[in-house]
Swiss-Prot record:
Lineage start: Bacteria, Bacillati, Actinomycetota, Actinomycetes, Kitasatosporales
Keywords assigned: Carbohydrate metabolism, Cytoplasm, Glycosidase, Hydrolase
Entry-linked Pfam families: Alpha-L-AF_C
Biological processes, Gene Ontology terms: arabinan catabolic process; L-arabinose metabolic process
Family in the record: Belongs to the glycosyl hydrolase 51 family.
Name of the protein in its database record: Intracellular exo-alpha-(1->5)-L-arabinofuranosidase
InterPro entries xref list: Alpha-L-AF_C (IPR010720), Glyco_hydro_b (IPR013780), Glycoside_hydrolase_SF (IPR017853)
Length: 662
């Protein structure tokens, strides 16, 4: 199989990863809460009824923001039912999932659960804008966040929570575009109530972060029009707009299922374009970020039959999908899609956390175990913090019925302080290993710390109660890093995490911009004897490539795969860098316009610049001669030979210098 390739350079980044990208979701649905995170009679339960075995797995998973209480559940949610003494809390019908809600796990228990996860866990609270409105949202905000001295804040203290909950991130309803939603609204109706709620909540706390409801999927008939209408009302009042997407194979189309991230990336880019279009129309400098607060692999087609058969039970077994290796590979590819858009996707919530389409499964009174999807998420959360590098893959492709031609390789990379890089990669091929070659430019990394893969000879292999460790990541041999080239072989249908690092982590990282010129004493010239050992190629490189990257970027140089660059349309090889530098040389060349039929074959520079008449192509070329190494054996400071200036055939070499325009 042809080798897949891409280049990594810290000068070309997407953006910093927001820790909220590794959020999750706890909804009062099925066994997510009851016998999931909360089971008072369990052998590992603490005094609050929280399962300690589940808490340990949640910490290992690396979850940050946790969205609560829904989901469809929130459109019938009365927050007052979930506070106060447990014995006084009412039982309610949950219309969304045809279940009975006991309210034994409520707002206080949710905050306690987050505190026990650790300081990285952040509340993300949804308010009911389906059957309720502005007043109820304000009362919930006052109860949760106001310090003291009001009826609702004092009521919270009476309930045992003297300190405010400090909820900063709020969702203004859930999936209000969906006809299945209790209290479904049109975009105009929802936009007005969301704007009123946001404006009022900011009167209590101007620093709250608010998420407006976007479309429930890219396939919705109102997609894009919904976002545009809602943002027209709320653009200056909210910080994020939500996206929801779930994927499953349809009619046995596995190839399209494996390329599901193609749809997710398209979804993200279309919503970004819509948001920016609205901002431009409103002449606003503000950018709306994206909250992808529901995403997963979900075999949704069987859900309707499960729900319609229920007769209002408590915590029924619903949506308990058991994930295979293939599901985990698609899941990992969705994670890669989120990381590749980290500049605009600043919040993401895996739906859900326990039992319900979840990476963690439990048995009432029994153990908890990890699903196959647990491992890509935990590795991405652990090693995917930092700056996402811009990855443009050159990969073999395959055909899909749904998305057309798709790459076999889906990849991204995250750099931390230029001391380590983690490559996350998925091989979508079901039949063959995929050779991978990565060029590391501007990254002084020399060793592979770990190459871990999630794959199996049986793509349908799963972890179950009987075999909880049937599928686990395994180390991969043969991955190497030499002379700035990372090479690996990605197993068929696999999720891969490859970590590379600097062998000298004790040294402080270089500050951005440091080393923009050579100020030290130049080393002695290399020996002229042909028998002398050749110096290490890495020793001839610049001690810092930040200056190189900045100057090339300033000259509008586009980097191409594997160390090639393009300067205004002219592909050139990057120069070899040495401690002995020559200054940059700038030359300008005017290209004469192509002669028209019947016109003279040569024209003067003056004629070439006359607008109209002949061809209007008056192209000015800006050519950069970078630092060049002095000739071997020469004294320091000896100028390097000047290259001949390239001009297009027929161009005038005597053209006057002029400024470049692009």
């Amino acid at each position: 199989m042809r080798t897949a390739r891409f280049t990594l350079d810290p000068a070309f980044t997407v953006g910093a990863v927001n820790p909220r990208l590794f959020g999750s979701f706890v909804e009062h649905l099925g066994r997510c809460v009851y016998t999931g995170v909360f089971e008072p009679g369990h052998p590992t339960a603490d005094a609050e009824g929280l399962r300690q075995d589940v808490l340990e797995l949640v910490r290992e998973l690396g979850v940050t923001a946790v969205r609560y209480p829904g989901g469809n559940f929130v459109s019938g949610y009365k927050w007052e039912d979930s506070v106060g003494p447990v014995e006084d809390r009412p039982r309610r019908l949950d219309l969304a999932w045809r279940s009975t809600e006991t309210n034994r796990f409520g707002l206080s228990e949710y905050i306690a659960f987050l505190k026990k996860i650790g300081p990285q866990a952040e509340p993300m609270m949804a308010v009911n804008l389906g059957t309720r409105g502005v007043a109820e949202a304000l009362e919930l905000q006052e109860y949760a966040n106001h310090p003291s001295g009001t009826a609702l804040s004092d009521l919270r203290a009476e309930h045992g929570d003297k300190d405010p909950f400090g909820i900063r991130l709020w969702c203004l309803g859930n999936e209000m575009d969906g006809p299945w939603q209790t209290g479904h609204k049109t975009a105009e109706e929802y936009g007005r109530v969301a704007a009123e709620t946001a404006r009022a909540m900011r009167q209590i706390d101007p620093d709250v972060e608010l998420v407006a409801c976007g479309s429930s999927g890219q396939s919705m008939e109102t997609f894009a029009e919904w976002e545009a209408t809602v943002l027209k009302e709320t653009y200056d009042l909210v910080d994020h707009i939500s996206l929801h997407a779930y994927y499953e194979p349809h009619d046995g189309d596995v190839d399209s299922f494996l390329a599901s991230a193609v749809d997710m990336e398209s979804f993200i880019e279309n919503v970004v374009a819509t948001c920016d279009h609205v901002g431009a129309r409103l002449k606003s400098k503000k950018k709306i970020n994206l909250s992808f607060d529901e995403w997963n692999v979900w075999y949704m087609t069987k859900t309707q039959a499960e729900v319609s058969a229920l007769d209002w039970p408590e915590a029924p077994r619903l949506l308990e999908d058991n994930y295979s290796v293939m599901d985990a590979v698609v899941f990992g590819s969705l994670l890669i899609a989120l990381l590749r858009h980290a500049d605009r996707v600043t919040v993401a919530c895996l739906a859900q956390l326990v039992n319900v389409i979840a990476p963690i499964m439990t048995e009432p009174g029994g153990p908890a175990w990890r699903q196959t999807t647990f491992f890509p998420f935990s590795q991405a959360s652990k090693y995917g913090r930092g700056e996402v590098l811009d990855v443009r893959v050159d990969s073999p492709t395959y055909d899909t019925a749904k998305y057309g031609e798709a790459d076999l390789l889906h990849a991204t990379a995250v750099v931390r302080a230029r001391r380590s890089v983690t490559v996350f990669a998925v091989n979508r091929s079901r039949t063959g290993a995929l050779p991978l070659e990565v060029a590391l430019s501007g990254l002084e990394l020399t060793e592979v710390v770990e190459h871990s893969a999630l794959a199996d000879a049986d793509p349908d292999a799963r972890n179950t109660l009987a075999e909880p460790e049937r599928v686990v990541p395994h180390p991969v041999d043969g991955t190497s890093l030499r002379d700035g080239r990372l090479t690996a072989a990605l197993e068929p249908l696999s999720w891969n995490s490859i970590r590379c690092a600097d062998p000298a982590p004790g040294q402080p990282p270089r500050r951005p911009g440091e080393g923009t010129g050579f100020t030290g004493t130049p080393p002695a010239a290399p020996p002229s004897s042909s028998s002398a050992p050749r110096p290490d190629p890495t020793a001839r490189r610049s001690p810092d490539r930040t200056a190189r990257a900045r100057v090339l970027a300033a000259a509008r140089v586009r980097r191409m795969p594997f160390g090639r660059t393009k300067v205004c349309g002219a592909p050139v090889r990057p120069p070899t860098y040495a401690p002995r530098f020559q200054p940059f040389r700038k030359t300008w060349t005017r290209w004469a316009p192509a002669p028209r039929s019947g016109s003279p074959s040569r024209r003067s520079p003056t004629e070439a610049s006359i607008p109209g008449g002949t061809s209007s192509r008056n192209v000015v070329r800006y050519q950069v001669t970078p630092w060049r190494r002095s000739p071997p054996g020469s004294a320091p400071g000896t100028p390097a030979p000047t290259r001949r200036r390239r001009t297009r055939a027929g161009a005038s070499r005597g053209a006057p210098r002029t400024a470049r325009r692009c």
